[in-house]
Swiss-Prot record, chain B:
It comes from Flavobacterium johnsoniae (strain ATCC 17061 / DSM 2064 / JCM 8514 / BCRC 14874 / CCUG 350202 / NBRC 14942 / NCIMB 11054 / UW101). The gene is nuoB. It is found in: Cell inner membrane. It catalyses: a quinone + NADH + 5 H(+)(in) = a quinol + NAD(+) + 4 H(+)(out). This is NADH-quinone oxidoreductase subunit B. Its main location: membrane. One of its GO terms (cellular component) is plasma membrane.
Length: 412, 182, 173
């Protein structure tokens, strides 16, 4: 049986031949293949199993490798934003804003306070969408389909807010160097207020379905735990690390875009198991809602939404047609002939899954010399074989869902 | 009631009498197949999230007969390929398509599945029609749920008008042979 | 008490003398270069020292510089982070162009396992002592290293791209 699935020189084939159980049963190999209903995204795991228990796992990734880093070496800076969208596509505004902040650090541009607050609002909305998907799909994997249908309605509401701001639903390509491409319409603020009214009761209902639910607790408590030391050694960041007990959050450690003005706690779990990850994400949604409310209250007056950097920010069309300098700036920006210093920058933002870093090395030309994305999913997925050792097969599925591995970010 | 904008589906052409309705086999089979297409969601990347939005309550795809998504190829009618297919993934896509039983249809959702999309690189397959025959292409990056539903409706038109004998006809066998699918 | 750049520089030069050099503050991250054979000792020192405490490996990646001299054609960049003092540090190691190899740090930081595999996959840099150095993102059968500058981005097997529409003529491509 094992000859059909594995080449005989594979490590698992040798283990199966050598090991004999007392009751005469053999070990088996299961291919949790790239296309599987419960794995969200395509990654393969070859599992060595003893009945229903998993002894070892061998992951294979790269089934959606789109060579982002190679593409980025051939594109001017503005054209790299659509690439960043498609990494963690559940919360694409965070990726976009992270990229713009990296460029602003490179070019030494100071973004006005109001634009920073607007960025904070959009990033927290994106974090809410990411956690909505992760937690509701975790619910679907344990068999509770209703929660997914209820909260997905609110993802539609957030999509409507994105459409008011930038025109797109999922892959937003939002913002420009120095701020936003247009000011937010009053309709966007109205929809945001309506969302802030309607969402909290729905999220409370969603939480009540799961947090004290006997079946959910049986399936998730003490499943897939990881200690804090192990998590730090494996490079965990984000909600997965905070569930293990370490309160590292990039928004607090290296505040960016005025996060230091806001008052929020960083929820931390205890044992790092699936239930803790679920609860940490739930609590983070409440914190994000509180940050959005604070940002709306403290929003500075006026309507400036971008920095005054004519070298990098497209001038308004009326000026392009009527004034010579604007025409020249427009031409230079579109052609990519903008002054770029030679430098190396590393900037990190707190993405939905952890520390999303951008390492940019320029050489003065219109495209980056080297752009590397520090993708949190890629780094913490290494711990997955260790987390499922000794677990049942259905537990492995739950652990994978709760880690929130997004294939676009895994392979880039 | 009579001036409402609701489009009533009309029965196929045929002879009606007391207690019987005679029509062509093709029409009845086409009607039955078109309104019960079970999808196999082959979701790889961002278009998969828009598919989840299409299956959710707002843009319910289940109204069109796709109530039960089947992840087993043997039990699915249409293969919805959503997202970028890389060259590493192409043999697996091929295997899934070959395991599907006739009649089977393929919708390529999104720019990446139709033609490689924005990723013109060494590792991305430039369109799934390099490995499997495709019936409907839905462009967009990602396409809105309304567009995906439109793609499914176009497929329904195709299915309604398809002949029952098509799958054993020499043209179809030639099409499969051109993709090296036995 | 915050960790100052001068403090780091002094501690490192007194332990490693001439194997660490070119200390400078690149924008907001303190950067230094190191020589390839001392890298494991350097990283272990940075992790275990009670003052420096750079206990988290943020990132590991490679860069290709085909225009440099042959001893500095490839670079491996390590980003380390100290969460207690919120301090980041970047270490660059330049490698030979013909045979780029460097010792692995996967026994010091478990998270560097896949990052080194990715760097091998893209650049062909050999990590000596790595438990499983094979390709991770590309197909296993691939022979060339795609992120090197001489490798083309586009799929060379395409037949349906009409060069006229892309402005490609015999003279410019």
């Amino acid at each position: 049986m094992s000859e059909l699935l594995l080449p005989p020189e594979h490590r698992y084939a040798k283990i199966i031949k050598e090991r004999h159980n007392e009751d005469g049963s053999e070990l088996s190999v299961l291919n949790l293949g790239p296309t599987h209903p419960a794995t969200h995204g395509i990654f393969q795991n070859i599992l060595l199993m003893d009945g229903e228990r998993i002894l070892e796992a061998e992951p294979t990734i790269g089934y959606i490798h789109r060579a982002f880093e190679k593409i980025a070496e051939n594109r001017p800076f503005y054209q790299i934003t659509p690439l960043t969208d498609r990494m963690n596509y559940c919360s694409s505004p965070i990726n976009n804003m992270g990229w713009w902040m990296t460029l602003e650090k490179l070019l030494g541009i100071e973004v006005p306070k109001r634009a920073q607050y607007l960025r904070v609002i959009v990033m927290e909305l994106a974090r809410i969408t990411d956690h909505i998907i992760c937690n509701s799909i975790l619910g679907v994997d344990t068999g509770a389909y209703t929660g997914f249908l209820y909260v997905f309605q609110f993802r539609e509401k957030i999509y409507e807010i994105y459409e008011e701001i930038c025109g797109a639903r999922l892959t937003t390509n939002m913002g420009r160097i120095g701020g936003f491409e247009r000011d937010w319409s009053p309709e966007a603020f109205r929809k945001l207020d309506k969302f802030l009214e309607e969402f909290p009761p729905a999220w409370k209902e969603f939480e009540n379905l799961f947090e004290r639910n006997r079946i959910f607790l049986d399936r998730t408590v003490n499943v897939g735990g990881i200690t804090a030391e192990k998590a730090m050694a494996y490079g965990f960041t984000g909600p997965n690390l905070r569930a293990a007990g370490v309160d590292y959050d990039v928004r607090v450690a290296h505040p960016y875009s005025s996060y230091e003005d806001f008052d929020f706690i960083v929820p931390v779990g205890k044992s790092g198991d699936t239930y803790d990850r679920f609860c940490v994400r739930n609590a983070e949604v409440w914190e994000s809602l509180s940050i959005i409310r604070q940002a709306l209250e403290k929003m500075p007056e006026g309507n400036e939404y971008h920095a005054e950097v004519p070298d990098y920010y497209l001038p308004p069309k009326e000026d392009v047609y009527n004034s010579m300098e604007s025409l020249i700036y427009h031409f230079k920006i579109v052609m990519g002939e903008v002054p770029v210093p030679v430098s190396e920058i590393y900037h990190a933002v707190e993405g939905g899954n952890g520390e999303l870093g951008f390492y940019l090395s320029t050489d003065g030309s219109r495209t980056p010399y080297r752009l590397h994305f520090r993708r949190p999913c890629f780094i913490y997925y290494q711990a997955f074989p260790e987390m499922i050792k000794g677990a049942l097969l259905s537990d492995a599925i739950i652990i994978l869902s709760s880690l929130n591995v997004i294939a676009g970010e895994l392979d880039a | 009631m009579s001036d409402s904008k609701v489009n009533m589906v009309s029965p196929p052409e045929g002879l009606t009498g007391e207690g019987f309705f005679a029509t062509k086999l093709n029409d009845v089979v086409g009607l039955a197949r078109a309104n019960s297409l079970w999808p196999l969601p082959f979701a790889t990347s961002c278009c998969g999230i828009e598919f989840m939005a299409t299956m959710a309550a707002h843009y319910d795809l289940a109204r069109f007969g796709s109530e039960r998504v089947s992840f087993s190829p043997r039990q699915a009618d249409m293969l919805l390929v959503m997202g970028t297919i890389s060259k590493k993934m192409a043999p697996i896509l091929r295997q899934v398509y070959e395991q599907m039983s006739e009649p089977r249809w393929v919708i390529a959702v999104g720019a990446c599945a139709s033609s490689g999309g924005v990723f013109d690189t060494y590792s991305v397959l430039q369109g799934i029609d390099k490995v499997i025959p495709v019936d409907v292409y839905v462009p967009g990056c990602p396409p809105r749920p309304e567009q995906i539903v439109d793609g499914v409706m176009r497929l329904q038109e195709l299915v309604k008008s398809e002949s029952v004998r098509r799958r054993s006809s020499p043209e179809y066998q030639e099409l499969l042979a051109s993709y090296n699918i036995s | 008490m915050a960790l100052e750049n001068t403090q780091i520089q002094n501690k490192l030069t007194e332990t490693f003398n001439n194997d660490v050099f070119n200390f400078h503050e690149e924008r907001d991250i303190f950067t230094l270069e190191a020589s390839a054979d001392k890298i494991t000792a350097l990283i272990l020192f940075l992790k275990n020292d009670s003052e420096l405490q750079f206990h988290f490996l943020t990132d590991l990646c490679g860069i290709h510089y085909p225009d440099n001299e042959s001893e500095r054609q490839f670079a491996v960049v390590y980003h380390l982070h100290n969460w207690f003092e919120n301090k980041r540090i970047r270490i660059k190691v330049y490698l030979n162009g013909e045979k780029p190899e460097i010792k692995t740090i996967s026994n010091i930081f478990l998270s560097s396992n896949w990052m080194e595999r990715e760097t091998y996959d893209f650049y062909g840099i050999d990590f000596i002592g790595h438990p499983q150095l094979k390709r991770i993102l590309n197909m296993d059968e691939m022979v060339s290293f795609p992120m090197r500058k001489e490798f083309p981005m586009e799929d060379s097997g395409r037949t349906d791209k009409d060069d006229r529409f892309f402005g490609r003529t015999v003279s410019n491509c």
